[in-house]
Amino acid sequence: MDKLVKLSRITFCIGLAGMVGPQLFYSAFGNNFFPAWPHLPLVPVWVCLFTVAVLAACIAIVFRIKARTAALLLGGLLLAIYIFGYFTYDLFVAQYNNHLGTWADGLKESALAGGAFVVAGSLPADSSVQKSVVLRFLQKLIPFGPFLFCTTMVLYGICHFLYTQPISGLVPAWIPGHMFWTYFGGSALILGGVTVTLKIKLNITAFLLGLMILIWLFIIHIPLSVNDPFGNNSNSIVSAFSALSFCATAFIISGMAASERPV
């Protein structure tokens, strides 16, 4: 299972890098990272700084260059931008903030922050972390990584029941019973998120959650990316990479549980 964890760490970073990469091309924040705050100055500059920081953290994790520190800083960055960016925007600015769908874009960033903390928890301890107040604080957030990730999974599962028609339209035409699979997928996300949060048969439930998202990657997200690679600032490609990061997060949780390491 250690091999699964190591491979999944790399996969998480590839997915996250694939999500932020298009931002440099479009000089705009992706739908999942920062909302359209009115009158925000120097947007291309902030986009560049954020993207470079995320890519640098991903490279450090993949090549094990102060990897735990990089993962902690990555998780802290994503969580801070979610709280002060998307969460605040959705709470005070968004017109339809009483609809769960309004919060859906930002929830991906929350899940990615949780994934970064899961990655940090899967890496060996780093003595340099104890020398920094910020890193010591971020290290205390590691146990909340699975909760952040699973909260998004549960809420996305609920979206399958609230927005059945548009979500069922994502099911490929060659698969019969679109409505059934929409409800099934929503139920599976809710069940997976709850069981992983409660650590019920954690190695099995987290693995099945990751496997389900991986299957969706191949039968839903990749075909959509091929059909419309550049629409809405390459949103289909970004969604495919987010699915890659999400399944990697679930596999890391599963691998750590199987190795009887704290998650």
Regions found by a protein language model. Give the residues of each.
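Extended, low-polarity transmembrane helix blocks
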Residues: 1-28, 32, 44-56, 62-162, ...
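Short juxtamembrane and helix-loop transition motifs at transmembrane-helix boundaries
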Residues: 28-41, 163-176
